[in-house]
Amino acid sequence: MELKVLNTAGTETGEVVILRDDIFGIEISEHAMYLDVKSILANKRQGTHKAKTRSEVRGGGKKPFRQKGTGNARQGSSRSPIHVGGGTIFGPQPHTYEQKVNKKVKLLARRSALSAKAQAGKIVVVDDFRFDAIKTKPFADILKNLGLDAKKTLLLMPEYDMVVNRSGRNIAKLEIMTADKASTYDILYSNTLLVQKSALKTIDETLG
């Protein structure tokens, strides 16, 4: 697949890049993407939820009333789950939600996500750009020139750049990350992939 390279003004540079078919042109595996995204979201969960059982609730050590002679059903504790203020039966307990996915499946999922974006025409390749100072407006102007100012956009860069990162972190609907760190979820969550030209080499090295 061929894509025209744009400059920061939104016009064509005359240069064309070729996207590798084994990364951007494979048959999309929805199941692989499902497994990878599910594991990514599950692994973000802390799993620190906790409800106290009857043995953990404060109080309830004394028998509420004598065993016989009151006419009531016998009770051994005021912290029984049937009482208000009592423990919880089968409540949530701390545990890990971690889900493991094989490396080959994760690789297939990322390739499938990139192929889905490419087939939908949602990949924009732009010349590499940097800023001399941390300024949001020049960054916002670039997105506007490219017609991406109102869309959820993921900018993929070849390497981390503090100035670019800080310039864009206050722009709504924009995420910035290095090309080797973008997960299946990151790619699918965005509406458009804005890829710096030299980041394509990073993608080839990571997923090739």
Swiss-Prot record:
Keywords: Ribonucleoprotein, Ribosomal protein, RNA-binding, rRNA-binding. The lineage of its organism: Bacteria, Pseudomonadati, Chlorobiota, Chlorobiia, Chlorobiales. This is Large ribosomal subunit protein uL4. The keyword Phosphoprotein does not apply. The keyword Cell membrane does not apply. Residues 45-95 are annotated as: Disordered. Belongs to the universal ribosomal protein uL4 family. GO terms for molecular function: rRNA binding; structural constituent of ribosome. It comes from Chlorobium chlorochromatii (strain CaD3). Residues 69-80 have a biased composition (Polar residues). Part of the 50S ribosomal subunit. One of the primary rRNA binding proteins, this protein initially binds near the 5'-end of the 23S rRNA. It is important during the early stages of 50S assembly. It makes multiple contacts with different domains of the 23S rRNA in the assembled 50S subunit and ribosome. Pfam families: Ribosomal_L4. It comes from the Bacteria. GO terms for biological process: translation. InterPro entries: Ribosomal_uL4, Ribosomal_uL4-like, Ribosomal_uL4_dom_sf. One of its GO terms (cellular component) is ribosome.
